[in-house]
Amino acid sequence: GAERRDHVERWSLGSVLALWAVDALAGLFGPALGAGAGAGPLGWVLSVLTAALAGLAAAAHIWRWWLWQPRRTTAVPLVWVLHLAYLWIPLHLLLRVAAEFGGLSPSLATHALTVGAIGGMTIGMMTRTARGHTGRLLEADHWEVAAYALIAVAALLRVGLPLIWPAALMTAVLLSALAWAAGMGIYSWRYWPILTRARIDGRPG
């Protein structure tokens, strides 16, 4: 089954906390230092430190994700959707490394986190908690799987398409928004009647 290793947990958390601290410094002093591509010496050091911490955090979170053995959850949509969403966190961090030196737009890293990780976690947990708290089995049918897939496609379109074809940015934004709306629309259509009625097991709540 899934493994938990304390040193991996420490590196996963510690590297991200350190990255956040450097982000805070960059926010406070970056404009004065000229941080980023073409920066002065101090700004360049800040960019290198940011990229190094983002790379370290990405490696730690990929390792952590792999220890969970996500390949064994492919038959359980309520679980694999969370593993898939989590994978966007190290992808976000790797994109930050590239963005730090002007290799690509920082917006791609941001959307890997927001659309991919947060969007996927949100749709996964909304379905899981809605089913659990209304007395239903923790099972996902083809409608839930379709919603999960559409949110994943939205992330791939928003991040992947501009990455390989920068001129298609606006097309990527439009297609991603449509996929997102469709995925959340399926959730709303499926779960409105579930969430506005009493529990099916007769228990309060």
What are the residue ranges of the model-derived segments?
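Hydrophobic alpha-helical transmembrane segments of multi-pass integral membrane proteins
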Residues: 1-205
